[in-house]
Amino acid sequence: MTLTQLLHDKLAAALIAAGVPDAQPLLQPASRPEFGDFQANGVMAAAKQRKMNPRELAQQVIDKLDLAGIASKIEIAGPGFINITLAPDFLAKRLDTVLDDARLGVRSVTEPQRVMVEYSSPNLAKEMHVGHLRSTIIGDTLARVVEFLGNNMVRGNHVGDWGTQFGMLTAYLVETRQAGKADLELSDLETFYRNAKIRFDEDPVFADTARNYVVRLQGGDADVLKLWEQFVDVSLAHCEAVYRKLGVGLTRADVRGESAYNDDLPVIVDELAAKNLLSEDDGAKVVYLDEFRNHDGDPMGVIVQKKDGGFLYTTTDLGAVRYRHKELNLDRVIYVVDARQSQHFQQMFTICRKAGFAPEAMSLEHVGFGTMMGDDGKPFKTRSGGTVKLIELLDEAEERAYALVSEKNPDLPEEEKRKIAHAVGIGAVKYADLSKNRNSDYIFNWDLMLAFEGNTAPYLQYAYTRVASIFRKVDRFDASAPLLITEPAEKQLALMLAQFSDVLNEVARTCFPHLLTQYLYQVATQFMRFYEACPILKSEGATQASRLKLARITADTLKTGLGLLGIEVLESM
């Protein structure tokens, strides 16, 4: 049981015993040390509802609150807050066995779920660009955390590998192959796509050929499918190069693109019709939803099949949900997709429920996110206004980090410099994004993200190496030594370390990775205060052993937490 859950359950029992069973404890960490360690704010609302004096009700709750061996002080503050100060011995006991556990005391969930996180999901017609960064790293972090908590994780890369543009690309592939330039052209997907588009726009004969390839592709023509597969293979190889550099856990096995649902789309439309959910509007097949209204107050329509018989993204997404329920038996699906797609997902989820493609027990969640902006406050672009390739951004991150490392440590071996530059550069880009509330837009700033001060990856990586350096200076470390929490800085660090499990559970529940970055930054800053206030190397005996143990738990927490963000730590920098 997590620390917060333990206190919550104790408070809930006390509220029941005090005659207010429907009241919520509303427990949260105290905002300042003078308010204790935790604060319960639920009494005031319960008192107001019953027209009682909130301080009197708070006292009744405290009289029933059993925190023996847990709290050293419980007091009423202000109009009826209950402030709880934890006993140092209690914290010591909770942390004492953490080093014996590779999971740092984080328990697996009692009822594991089958969870899919759908993320990254680029269109395979082009190379990945900076617009793919947020989905890729937010999704990867959520997948890592949810899996770490003991759930069965299914990663989903719903790539765009189908549609009319593939007729154009296949036609151009045939043309370049005949000219002996296919391999050269395919090595640069952006140029390949651009050249194909020019041919399509300027040459009517080529455009007709491309449309014919679409028909043949959708009809399952073996020769065209073979060409399409080659194109998909090359495109995925580009994606995998980005994933490797980013340290993202997606593999070829996680790819199930739009093409996988192609044969299901007519069935989806038939099943919607059988449920009397379809209407026809100017030849198109539409689902009208009373839950969504336009400006005139009329139900909004969602097209699932166009007048020409073609299907839309919504139809494919419906097929994917149906498959994920029937074949994968998922309990929860998390879609990490740009916030601008919010209405699409809410409408698609509503249709799924009405059609029975997903039962109510199957959680469907859209985890949206804002836009990465340039210094001008507009979406991040090249100086000339073009799209920034993601691989080029990551290369620049490494080069900038390499320059910093070379400046600070010019005598390091070249291989060591490159290793540090990779960890720091890639970590900086990822952390700068993950540390922001995902709902917000943010401004991309090289100087801020690569700084060794403040809430950045380099600061946390440096904090880890600083702890690691302590252990290179001691002759012996006894992990079984008892924790002795006597100084305020020791207690504050121990209190922070004891909340790791709470934070991970909250990240998994809310899908906000910045809660983890926030926590790790607090751990690092609290350790620095502890390091200044409580000498480790100059202390002796049981005191030194205890402080070393706190330092080791700190290092392991930083390493595990950063690992869940997909960020490397270094033993030295």
Curated annotation (Swiss-Prot):
<dbReference type="InterPro" id="IPR005148">
    <property type="entry name" value="Arg-tRNA-synth_N"/>
</dbReference>
<dbReference type="InterPro" id="IPR035684">
    <property type="entry name" value="ArgRS_core"/>
</dbReference>
<dbReference type="Pfam" id="PF00750">
    <property type="entry name" value="tRNA-synt_1d"/>
</dbReference>
<dbReference type="GO" id="GO:0005737">
    <property type="term" value="C:cytoplasm"/>
</dbReference>
<dbReference type="InterPro" id="IPR014729">
    <property type="entry name" value="Rossmann-like_a/b/a_fold"/>
</dbReference>
<keyword id="KW-0436">Ligase</keyword>
<keyword id="KW-0547">Nucleotide-binding</keyword>
<dbReference type="GO" id="GO:0006420">
    <property type="term" value="P:arginyl-tRNA aminoacylation"/>
</dbReference>
<dbReference type="GO" id="GO:0004814">
    <property type="term" value="F:arginine-tRNA ligase activity"/>
</dbReference>
<protein>
    <recommendedName>
        <fullName>Arginine--tRNA ligase</fullName>
        <ecNumber>6.1.1.19</ecNumber>
    </recommendedName>
</protein>
<dbReference type="Pfam" id="PF03485">
    <property type="entry name" value="Arg_tRNA_synt_N"/>
</dbReference>
<dbReference type="InterPro" id="IPR009080">
    <property type="entry name" value="tRNAsynth_Ia_anticodon-bd"/>
</dbReference>
<keyword id="KW-0648">Protein biosynthesis</keyword>
<dbReference type="Pfam" id="PF05746">
    <property type="entry name" value="DALR_1"/>
</dbReference>
<keyword id="KW-0963">Cytoplasm</keyword>
<comment type="subunit">
    <text>Monomer.</text>
</comment>
<keyword id="KW-0067">ATP-binding</keyword>
<dbReference type="InterPro" id="IPR001278">
    <property type="entry name" value="Arg-tRNA-ligase"/>
</dbReference>
<dbReference type="GO" id="GO:0005524">
    <property type="term" value="F:ATP binding"/>
</dbReference>
<dbReference type="InterPro" id="IPR036695">
    <property type="entry name" value="Arg-tRNA-synth_N_sf"/>
</dbReference>
<keyword id="KW-0030">Aminoacyl-tRNA synthetase</keyword>
<feature type="short sequence motif" description="'HIGH' region">
    <location>
        <begin position="122"/>
        <end position="132"/>
    </location>
</feature>
<dbReference type="InterPro" id="IPR001412">
    <property type="entry name" value="aa-tRNA-synth_I_CS"/>
</dbReference>
<comment type="similarity">
    <text>Belongs to the class-I aminoacyl-tRNA synthetase family.</text>
</comment>
<dbReference type="InterPro" id="IPR008909">
    <property type="entry name" value="DALR_anticod-bd"/>
</dbReference>
